Amino acid sequence: SEMCIRDRFKIDYVGDEIAVEWTVNRAGGNNSMTDEMQQADESDIKTAGKSICTKISVDGTDRKETKNRLKLALYSMIEKGTGKSLPWGTLSGIRPTKIAMKCIEDGMNDKETYDYLKETYLASDEKIDLSIGIAKREKALLDKVDYDNGYSLYIGIPFCPSTCAYCSFTSYPLGVWKNRVDDYLDALEKEIDYTAQKFYHKKLNSIYIGGGTPTTLSPAQLDRLIRKIKCSFDLKDCLEFTVEAGRPDSITREKLLALKKNGISRISVNPQTMKQQTLDIIGRHHTVDDTIQSFKLARELGFDNINMDLIMGLPEETLDDVRHTMELVKELAPDNVTIHSLAVKRAARLTIFKDRYSDMQMVNTQEHMDLCAAYCKQMGLEPYYLYRQKGMAGNMENVGYAAKGKAGVYNILIMEEKQTIVACGAGASTKRVWPVPNPDGTHRIDRCENVKDVGQYITRIDEMIERKQRLFEEK
């Protein structure tokens, strides 16, 4: 039926607050939009006596396009009215490099890709350049991966020495579950057996043991788990085997030796910051020196691909604190550095007990990110993957930097969503990527998740396996 739409945005800017009212009046009750529909947006921003108006015209046959045009109009008006802009413009998704990658795969050159990202999302020049550069490096790395006949494996170890204030991942204090770790490994091995049998005809391209903190396991338990994986899967096509050692207070010589003798090619030693006061605030029960000594021990034992995670926007951290952290990291010369922007989720202690942290400053800016990028460049590291999350400090991003030949393949695969990832363990989420593309070039993705609670995972392991069976038996 005939329908006309009139969207009116009223935005009153008072002090530092913006109130938005968006009403849509539709005649005919039809939710679809008709061809050749003219839409007039009368948009008023009142700020210090000024009024800013805009009118746009769209072909309403494409709902997604119409939504994007409305977002652009609203964003542009708010930008004019407040004098403020966002580094990523209207982009709110977590994988901006997927857009740049799609442009490259469609044959666009750098200029055409830049113009598309600028015109479609109003992203800043810095973020567009970052996205294009990373997408090109990702494409070169992913050319080695067989999407259709390959897959990757994630193993979750949901235990930590303690829970960090910002963390919302599936993790539990080891002290509470110490007597059930072997039971957990029993259940995990059962899920590994199913996966190995189901995917025996596929190429295993990468393995990632994460958590939690995998090195909360004892040396014997680490050896047991990795030997189980090596005995269960054909690793001849495996490009990378990562164990996220993570917390320096969980790392010992014996554990590193267990990893080394089993051929682990990549590990993480994650300080998050090199400021001791911040470590104490966020509940990481280790010292700056623990990080330094753990890293040096790993180097001494021959690990030549070590990542270090850092977080921008932690409580009470200044730009000078970040500079101090990067100076110490530079002295260690890791092969990978991952710069995270603090993203506090509902389940994190920073949210649950927010009154305790309400007086603490948590700031991340483009200046912070640029400083980290400059230090990484000095270390010979280039950005190779990027992702975003809701509620990120400064509306920034997470960026992985790596030396030549040391980029994390699994990190790229999980962000680009081009290959199936089978995930085992409590709270692990399996992602099936269908090989036949949709008309728009994207791929259908289906998921199944394991229960998060360790006790439930142990007792319901058969059900977890059945979930995977249903996911992969669908034709």
PLM regions with names:
Residues N364-A393, V422, A428-K475:
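C-terminal accessory region of radical SAM enzymes
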Residues D7-G60:
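Amphipathic beta-strand/beta-sheet edge segments enriched in Tyr/Trp
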Residues E2-I5:
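Short, small-residue-biased leader/transition segments that mark boundaries at the very start
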Residues S171-C372:
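Conserved non-cysteine loop/helix-boundary elements of the Radical SAM core domain that shape
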Residues D148-D183:
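Canonical Radical SAM [4Fe-4S] cluster-binding loop centered on the CxxxCxxC motif
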Residues A347-C424:
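A C-terminal junction/extension of Radical SAM enzymes
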Residues T82-S85, E105-D106, D110-L153:
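N-terminal [4Fe-4S]-dependent radical SAM core
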